[in-house]
């Protein structure tokens, strides 16, 4: 799982290229132009899911944990039922793996589509 400033993804993608190839990577990074600069602008135009796939070549990307705020996540276990966690990805097996992990920590994965749906 990557949960870093979006601007760090180009360097991480290069540094970890061999390590992440073929691995499921849950991408919880959101592009904020004021913080992350030009790469965030590009991600906002293209869509963060598709841009992350370019920046992390060979990884099996699943976008998750970036559409529900931290405050809401922290309150999720105080209420009955499960909070839905939107996830997006193009690899069905990677989505299944991510869904299992998300359920194990108490959320309900909600598949919203492919990486093109993982906009921000």
Language model regions located:
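Conserved residues at beta->alpha junctions
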Residues: 3-4, 43, 89
């Amino acid at each position: 799982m990557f949960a870093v400033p979006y601007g760090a993804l180009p360097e991480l993608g290069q540094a970890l290229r061999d390590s992440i190839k073929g691995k499921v990577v849950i991408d919880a990074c959101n592009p904020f132009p004021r913080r992350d600069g030009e790469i965030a602008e590009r991600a906002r135009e293209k869509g963060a899911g598709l841009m992350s796939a370019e920046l992390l070549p060979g990884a099996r990307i699943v976008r998750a944990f970036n559409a529900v705020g931290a405050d809401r996540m922290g309150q999720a276990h105080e209420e009955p039922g499960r909070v839905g966690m939107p996830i997006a990805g193009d690899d069905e097996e990677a989505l299944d793996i991510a869904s299992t992990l998300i359920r194990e920590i108490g959320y309900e994965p909600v598949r919203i589509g492919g990486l093109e749906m993982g906009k921000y």
